[in-house]
Amino acid sequence: MSPARGRAACKTCRSRKQKCDGIRPACSRCRSLGLQCTWPTVLKRGPPKGYTKALEARLAETELVLIRLLHATNDEGLLARAFDGDTQKRAHKRFGERNTELKSSVIGEHKMLALMDHWERFPLRTADDVRQWIGEVSKTSMMQGEGTNQSNEKTRGLLRVESSSGNADYQHEDEVQSPAGAGDDMAVGDPYRDDSVDQDSIGQPPQRTESVGNMQPACETHAVQDITTSSRIELPADFKDQFLW
């Protein structure tokens, strides 16, 4: 990324009356000479030419219209209605929006020029001028309100689309992860599965089985043990003492 390039020259180049390339934070000349590169403070631009006079003229016209209306109506209730809660809220809201737009130097300058053009096209010198101005302001307010509503509707529509898309993806994922044959009658047969094998016996340790031919009654078993015990040869005592330990 190339360094930022400014319009004004640095203080060092300006004091030496030399050409400055305007590269920030340090220009090429200051870097080559090993000098500290400092820059002048950028001042905010003032209002465009003629804005102050146009603003003063517009303010005078507005005050004159207000005075004429009050003298023509001579209605105390009109002042009360003009300063009720709803009217003051709308006026303060509009004033706050305009004041916020004028805070930025660049946007404020364009806005000031637009206001000067608006004041020139809609003066407040006659009753017809005031009616036209009121109609223009009302139309602009309605267009701004419709634009805000359309923007809000578009945002809500996008949120609904994203929400429905997320639900559809979640449902599709559940369908993919679920087994294909959840029911018993819809299960697909396993070619390696023997239907004669009980599935409950899977995982249980094998049971010890004996053949029928090897099984003997308990009485015969005791008899064989007695015969084996009785058939032992009794050795003499001298032989036991000599050869047995």
Curated annotation (Swiss-Prot):
Region annotation Disordered: where it falls in the sequence: 162-216
Extent of Polar residues compositional bias: 199-214
InterPro entries linked: AtrR-like, Zn2-C6_fun-type_DNA-bd_sf, Zn2Cys6_DnaBD
Localization of this protein: Nucleus
One Gene Ontology molecular-function label: DNA binding
Signal sequence segment: none
Alphabetized UniProt keyword annotations: DNA-binding, Metal-binding, Nucleus, Transcription, Transcription regulation, Zinc
Ranges annotated as DNA-binding: 10-37
GO cellular component term of the entry, any: nucleus
PANTHER family given in the database record: HALOTOLERANCE PROTEIN 9-RELATED, TRANSCRIPTION FACTOR PDR1
Function: Transcription factor; part of the gene cluster that mediates the biosynthesis of the mycotoxin fusaproliferin (FUP) that belongs to the class of bicyclic sesterterpenoids.
Protein name: Transcription factor FUP7
Organism: Fusarium proliferatum (strain ET1)
